[in-house]
């Protein structure tokens, strides 16, 4: 097959909505949504602030199978409030992960796939969102004992804030060139540090720090794949087949502490230096 034909046959992943992304990864005909839009479970706080809510609060929860393995698939809609998490959306995610734990305790090997496009906590529901993300993180740590918890950060919103910490707790992290992963978003850093220090409009600069390629080269992501539905699905299947890793990245904190102690904070570290610093992390 020629390169041109491959390009024509390619089906982008990041152009899909949250619900379409979930369906693209699951085995055909197995998609079953929990608390779908017709359940009308939406944020009670947005209306009070004259913000139009969404019937699913921007979070899609589905059960199904991938290669006949039971999975719960969690997909955040980045087009609604920047993918921010509030009380309802966060509770849906935490609840879905807890249900997966219950499945495993009953002998049903349910894994979790997180498709994340989020700026973190929803400012209009700050404290409630923070509490929800704490529950999500605890649920991930609990579930990953039994089955892989796989995070996919494909773009174009990226994954920031408290949910970026949740990603670091996952068994495996899959990213694309368009995906970004970082604790603080570019606009937040620019506001605090100034445009001379961190220009949020400089796309090459931003992606050189938080982009998928940089995160993978630094050992902070496990896979770097093309923006293609089939390739992302194949990578997820590969990690489901591998099962629970021998050591989760977050359990290897001593490695990162030792590396960070080598950094001279008097000088700005470059993306290339970050890659060199973490060389051998995946060995």
Residue ranges and their predicted role:
Residues 48-50, 80, 103-108:
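Conserved P-loop NTPase/AAA+ ATPase motor core
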Residues 57, 85-108:
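A short, well-ordered alpha-helical element
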Residues 119-248:
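Conserved catalytic cores of soluble enzyme domains
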Residues 1-34, 191-283:
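Amphipathic alpha-helical segments at domain termini/boundaries
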Residues 3-72:
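Short beta-strand/loop segment at the start of cytosolic alpha/beta domains
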Residues 66-91:
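STAS-typified acidic loop motif
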Residues 72-76, 110-119, 150-154:
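Glycine- and acidic-rich phosphate- and metal-coordinating loops
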Residues 58-60, 65-69, 79, 95-97, ...:
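Small-residue-centered hinge/linker elements
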